[in-house]
Regions:
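Conserved hydrophobic/aromatic pocket- or pore-lining residues that grip, position, or stack substrates
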Residues: 142, 186, 265, 363, ...
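Short beta-strand element of the alpha/beta-hydrolase
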Residues: 410, 418-429
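Beta-propeller folds
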Residues: 1-388, 403, 438-439, 651, ...
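Secondary-structure transition/capping motifs at alpha-helix termini
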Residues: 145-150, 210, 214, 243-246, ...
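N-terminal cap/lid segment of alpha/beta-hydrolase-fold proteins
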Residues: 377-418
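Extracellular/periplasmic catalytic domains that process cell-envelope and extracellular macromolecules
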Residues: 15, 25, 179-181, 418, ...
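Active-site-proximal cap/loop segments of hydrolase catalytic domains
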Residues: 429, 435, 439-655
Length: 655
């Protein structure tokens, strides 16, 4: 950095197929890198004739897993996987360029240094692979090696995870990693319920501790599913556990040397954003590991600060002995400001990201004692020509009393009382009860940034946008039993509110969404006449093709066939009587949203005489990245609503 010149450290070929090819060691003098085997040779060529059939077999083992994409499909895929993923873990001295090979060539899921850098936790993927699950579920051999490459200890491996059910966890050791502040200590988890969330047991998990030269020891057991552990430099652990059926989350204070003395700090509904006390603040230590910042009996908490006025992030001090909480900072009510980092041990100086409706996000250093704010960046408005966009936060009510909300955006030059074509954009979410479903999310003071294929581009074409309109599906684990009814009610409430505000008229309001929002769009058009037209991007429309669960639905198709059927707009394609535009990436790798979902939905619509258009984008995934794809998507969306919404003839009224 002093000379601003770059130099080559070593003449090696890095292997970045698995992600980051190099990472810094603690001393900042060495890099841990994954290298290509110099003897690897040219990539294998696909044989002209298949080597044999593709075979899968099951033998009575239950394995209800979700649908995945981009999996290994053929024996040749296995050969390519081995070729590209094989690497040699190596230490490279930055000063001299000297290399130290740490292990033989293999396929490594991770190669993690201990806090001191003297040891490495090695997770190596081994055969047999699977055609059913992604490589993160492949079998692994696990061991610890020293910095000179010598084997220190072999650990229990991870079996192939083809039988882990939806909502469950693997059987055997999982989440193994170095314990913060301990150079020769590992922690890992073991399921006590066989990995089955439906099993009726006293405890779900147990946390284990393993000294490299000793036998494993049980630290504690959790009644709910383990959800995370952070440790302070003084050795105090903060352990979280979560119960999905009740949405209950607990946070425990655990002295790691005396875990029997653990103390419950709080138990709360994870969906209750208003009541969230925050999350313990973590910082990086000299070892490059995260630890909870603790000052005597005090720790720091950060959170979104959700309220009925929107999110106002905060930083608190929390006393572990008294339960007393002291507010150090809270974002103002006329802006949106998030805390990025604490800059000193006493949390007197913090780095924040500040924005308003008129000012784009910039970074500032805040001195909490003096109140002074110092700008670090001065990023300009990326689109000043759109600075006249008007924004207001809107609340309204569904016919069953559930509170709803959205952000109404009006185009530059809008005159009050003018009725515009309106685009309602939404994404449904499930909740356990109506109170938490009605809580406000987001902040109306955020800067409106328009980019990519955002639906906010409609603001440049004379449309109003009813953004992030809430579509809550209330009812806990059985919420989807009334999915369609609640969805239609939420959509109707949005239309009624827009009409009451004097912004829209019932003949020119459209609905749109991406992914689960596309699923929502198709359902609303099938079961309601509230909207004039719709846009559905990268969606799934036939839930029988995701038979082992989706979103928060844990029941399988065979456990709740009527729910899967009634929720699938494909089954109601004959009822879709509003124009629908569908867009999908041909390389969509998102679980459940196979491109065939859009292809079959379009075929069903065409077969019943509906007005529809299907756009399949080559080489695009769940989101679209190529400039050509982004521009084409925007053009299709605007043209569709221009024809079937903005300039559409009034609908006939029948009696």
């Amino acid at each position: 950095l002093e000379t601003t010149t770059a130099r080559q450290i070593s003449r090696v070929q890095l292997n970045a197929a698995r992600g980051g090819a190099c990472s810094w060691m603690r001393d900042s003098q060495q890099l841990l890198c994954h290298l290509v085997d110099p003897r690897r040779g040219r990539a294998p060529e696909k044989p002209m004739v298949p080597s044999g059939p593709i075979i899968q077999e099951t033998s009575g083992r239950v394995g209800a897993i979700r649908t995945y994409q981009d999996l290994l499909k053929t024996p040749f895929d296995v050969i390519l996987y081995d070729y590209y993923m094989t690497s040699i873990p190596t230490l490279i001295d930055v000063g001299s360029g000297r290399t130290t090979q740490l292990a033989s060539r293999g396929i490594y899921a991770s190669f993690s240094p201990s806090p001191s850098g003297d040891y490495f936790l090695v997770r190596e993927r081994v055969k047999p692979y699977s055609y059913l699950v992604p490589d993160g579920r492949f079998a692994e051999e696990i061991s610890v090696v020293a910095a000179d490459g010598d084997l220190v200890r072999e650990l229990p491996g991870k079996p192939l995870q083809e039988a882990t059910i939806v909502g469950g966890v693997p059987v055997g050791p999982r989440n193994i990693g170095w314990m913060t502040g301990r150079d020769q200590t590992l922690t890992y988890l073991e399921a006590l319920d066989g990995g089955d969330p439906n099993a009726d047991v006293e405890y779900r998990d147990r946390l284990m501790r393993l000294e490299l030269a000793a036998s494993p020891q049980e630290v504690l057991r959790t009644e709910f599913r383990y959800a995370g552990l952070s440790i302070s430099e003084s050795g105090t652990g903060f352990l979280s556990e979560f119960d999905q059926p009740t949405r209950t989350r607990r946070l425990w204070r655990v002295p790691m040397d005396d875990p029997d003395a653990k103390e419950l700090l709080w138990e709360r509904n994870s969906e209750d954003r208003y009541g969230d006390p925050g999350t313990p603040l973590t910082m990086l230590n000299d070892d490059g590991h995260r630890f909870v910042r603790q000052d005597g009996d005090w720790i720091f908490l950060t959170g979104a600060g959700a309220s009925d006025q929107g999110d106002r992030p905060f930083l608190d001090r929390f006393n572990l002995e008294t339960g007393e909480s002291e507010r150090l900072w809270r974002a103002g009510s006329d802006s949106y400001e998030t805390m990025v980092a604490v800059l000193d041990d006493d949390a007197n100086r913090i780095l924040t990201r500040y924005e308003t409706r008129a000012e784009p996000p910039n970074f500032y250093v805040r001195d909490l004692e003096s109140g002074q704010r110092t700008a670090l960046t001065d990023f300009p408005d990326p689109h000043p020509q759109l600075s006249g966009i008007q924004k207001q936060f809107v609340t309204y009510e569904r016919d069953d009393g559930v509170q709803l909300s959205a952000t109404l955006l009006l185009p530059p030059g809008y005159v009050e009382g003018q009725r515009l074509p309106v685009v309602v954009w939404a994404y449904p979410r499930e909740y356990s009860n109506a109170d938490v479903a009605g809580q406000v999310r987001g902040n109306p003071n955020q800067f409106t940034r328009i980019g990519g294929y955002s639906h906010l581009f409609f603001l440049t074409q004379g449309y109003a946008v009813f953004d992030a309109a809430t579509m809550p599906i209330v009812g806990g684990n059985l919420a989807n039993d009334t999915y369609v009814e609640q969805l239609v009610a939420s959509g109707q409430a949005a239309v009624d509110k827009l009409v009451d505000l004097g912004v829209g008229d019932r003949d020119r309001i459209g609905i749109g969404g991406h992914s689960y929002g596309a699923f929502m769009t198709a359902n609303i058009l099938a079961h309601s006449d509230a909207f004039r037209a719709g846009i559905a991007r990268s969606g799934a429309y036939n839930r029988t093709l995701t038979p082992f669960g989706f979103q928060n639905e844990r029941r399988t198709y065979w456990e709740a066939p009527e729910v899967y059927f009634s929720m699938s707009p494909f089954m109601a394609a004959d009822q879709v009587n509003e124009p629908m535009l569908m867009i999908h990436g041909l390389a969509d790798n998102n679980s459940g949203t196979f491109p065939i979902q859009s292809e079959r939905m379009f075929a069903a619509l065409e077969g019943h005489g509906a007005t529809a258009r299907l756009i399949m984008l080559e080489n695009e995934s769940h989101g679209y990245r190529a400039r050509e794809s982004v521009m084409h998507t925007l053009a299709e969306m605007v043209e569709w609503f221009d024809v079937y919404l903005k300039n559409a003839e009034p609908r006939r009224i029948t009696f």
